[in-house]
Amino acid sequence: MMIQLRKGRDGPATLACVRADGSRTWSKVHPFFPVHDLTHCAVESVLGFREAFFGLVASGWSLDDFAPRVPLPNEARQAECIVGIFDLERAQPAPYSAAQFNEMVSASLQGQGLGTFRHITDPELTRVRELRSQWSRSWAALELGGTLEIPFPAPPDGGSAAARRSA
């Protein structure tokens, strides 16, 4: 699947997902969500999630299917907790250690009745941070009207985010 984040010229950004079969879903997004969604792509790719946000979209879910009334698979809820910790981390002066990160994930999951998740390793945390940072820089540098394209799942080397200008 190809993730396309378009920086709005006269309005909000849009997120579009073009599936392997050519079908697509899209939505306008609040300014908070482009980096949040890029973090989802990094987390889901590095940790191998296939039933979290982008995995569900790739399997046919519409972006509108993620309304609060729709029950999500456990993996999607776990991914949202993990992405939320990365979102919190962005506001900190330094990244969390693996021990801190895993403790926060554990507390978040238990607080939501989601049980436990395996230990996330230092190399996995580093890789997610690298991808998020690379893609966030590309998003920030994108001109209004431009589109950032990222494959999902990201290849092991992270692939390259392609920025293009809209006509």
Regions found by a protein language model. Name each.
Residues 1-10, 17, 25, 31-35, ...:
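Metalloprotease/metallohydrolase-associated module, dominated by Zn2+-dependent proteases
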Residues 43:
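Short active-site segment of divalent metal-dependent hydrolases/proteases
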